[in-house]
UniProtKB/Swiss-Prot annotation:
UniProt keyword annotation of Mitochondrion present: no
Assembly mode: The Tol-Pal system is composed of five core proteins: the inner membrane proteins TolA, TolQ and TolR, the periplasmic protein TolB and the outer membrane protein Pal. They form a network linking the inner and outer membranes and the peptidoglycan layer.
Region forming the signal peptide: 1-19
Domain of life: Bacteria
Protein name: Tol-Pal system protein TolB
Intracellular or extracellular location(s): Periplasm
Protein function: Part of the Tol-Pal system, which plays a role in outer membrane invagination during cell division and is important for maintaining outer membrane integrity.
Keyword Thylakoid belongs to the record: no
Listed InterPro entries: 6-blade_b-propeller_TolB-like, PD40, Tol-Pal_TolB, TolB_N
Taxonomic lineage from the root: Bacteria, Pseudomonadati, Pseudomonadota, Alphaproteobacteria, Rickettsiales
Family: Belongs to the TolB family.
Alphabetized UniProt keyword annotations: Cell cycle, Cell division, Periplasm, Signal
GO annotation, cellular component aspect: periplasmic space
Length: 444
């Protein structure tokens, strides 16, 4: 966000060691850290309304992470607000608040708002973080997400993921279903439709810059086109007409290339396209179905699924197609692998069969499974769970969750998120049914 100006308060804030133990978000479930997000002080009524809304967004971000427990304002003892005073720490400890956020909102002559916050450790009575932002009124929500990101990063040691977007397929609740590409904030706010619903659309993907998306659209039942849409200008163009394509491309970390699967002559293979020259390079061979390629964060490897040995399993190869290695060995069939932005894990869909029929699972495995033969871990299961994608910090997975048709009611799909530990599963609210989420990087 170029029009947000940062002023790091390096002379005022001491980032010394503090009493709170840094939250480790990989090792099981920890009790959420109690935090008080105090009323933001304001210099006029407009700033007061904006500050009130920001406190709600910041508190909601921290609560949704599962790592913080915002304390109700009804229990606050100290009545002072703002950043100009030192808190009465004993009063905050009395209500078991380990952390305290104080803030201030001022309206500037330019029409922008100056937003300041300080994060306090109430146990050691020290400032942990603080920042000043200047934002136009329409970007107040992003400013709130950025403050929550700073708090999350200071306490967990990992970058936050709140100032991000989700692109997904919106599905009407009536039959026949109308599918549209939609865009929203990570928490479901600011939902916006990007296509008109006149044609079938599938698998939206962000470009690396997050200001463009790519998706597949079926102009006819047999002809699939890959479209590029600029989110700033709204302009749309056809990237290519690839007969046999069923999923939108996934992009290399440098944004210069993309990988996709294309079906031809009874087989489906992985191809890499140079986005500048539009030249295709075939990466897999033989007979079989090879789909769902995803780059490693450094762009040197590609993970995909293939039924070359009879049942769909996961494989890794070099980005030029060499050195193919199978990485999944469990029962069931595997699909939709997605490499974590951190490079440590690969998320996947796994379908198993039992006496009760098919079960869908979302799992994760180490990207180098030879280091741990039992690295596979299922984190959620259901009638339909599929299409996992990662938060930009590699600590949360978003996915599609579906329910079957009952009586005269059609089945439905919704978007859910879950921590990589398998805890804190929650629905991301959307206006209609939703599927195929894709998570952007943190916005600029």
């Amino acid at each position: 966000m170029r029009n947000i100006i940062y002023f790091i308060l390096s002379l005022l804030f001491s980032f010394a060691s503090y009493a709170l133990e840094t939250i480790n978000i990989e090792h099981g479930r920890a009790d959420p850290t109690p935090i008080a997000v105090n009323k933001f002080n304001a210099d006029n009524s407009a700033a007061d309304v904006l500050g009130h809304d920001m406190v709600k967004v910041i508190s909601n971000d921290l609560k949704l992470s599962g790592l913080f427990r915002p304390i109700s304002a009804a229990s606050f003892i100290e009545e002072k607000t703002g950043i100009e005073y030192k808190p009465l720490f004993a009063a905050w400890r009395q209500i078991n608040a380990s952390l305290l956020v104080n803030g201030e909102v001022k309206k500037l002559e330019s029409g922008k708002f100056k937003i300041s916050f300080i994060l306090w450790d109430t146990l050691l009575e020290k400032q942990l973080a603080g920042e000043i932002l200047e934002v136009p009124e329409n970007l107040w929500r992003r400013a709130a997400h950025k403050i929550a990101d700073k708090i999350y990063e200071k306490i967990t040691g990992d970058a936050g993921y709140f100032d991000t977007k989700i692109v997904y397929v919106s599905e009407s609740n009536s039959l026949p279903k109308i599918k549209r590409i939609a865009l929203m904030d990570y928490d479901g706010a600011n939902n916006k439709y990007l296509t008109n619903g006149k044609s079938l659309v599938l698998t939206p993907r962000f470009a690396r810059s997050a200001d463009k998306i790519f998706y597949v659209s079926y102009a006819t039942k047999r002809r699939a086109l890959v479209y590029e849409k600029d989110l700033k200008t709204g302009k749309e163009s056809v990237v290519g007409d690839f007969p046999g394509i069923s999923f939108a491309p996934r992009f290399s970390p440098d944004g210069r290339k993309a990988v996709m699967s294309i079906a031809q002559n009874g087989s489906t293979h992985i191809y890499e396209i140079d986005l500048a020259t539009k030249r295709l390079h075939k990466l897999t061979d033989g007979f079989g179905i090879n789909t769902s390629p995803s780059y490693s964060p450094d762009g040197k490897k590609i993970v995909y699924n293939s039924d070359r040995n009879g049942v769909p399993q996961l494989y890794i190869m070099n980005s030029d197609g060499s050195d193919v290695q199978r990485i999944s060995f469990g029962g069931g069939s595997y699909a939709a692998p997605s490499w974590s932005p951190r490079g440590d894990y690969i998320a996947f869909t796994k379908i198993t069969r039992g006496d009760g029929g098919k079960t869908f699972n979302i799992g994760i495995m180490k990207a180098c499974p030879q280091d741990d033969e039992n690295s596979e871990r299922i984190i959620t299961s259901g009638y339909l769970v599929e299409s996992p994608c990662w938060s930009p910090n590699g600590r949360v997975i978003m996915f599609t969750k579906g329910w079957p048709s009952r009586a005269k009611a059609p089945g439905k799909n919704k978007i859910f998120a879950i921590d990589l530990t398998g805890h804190n599963e929650r629905e991301i609210m959307t206006p209609a049914d939703a599927s195929d989420p894709e998570w952007s990087g943190v916005l600029n």
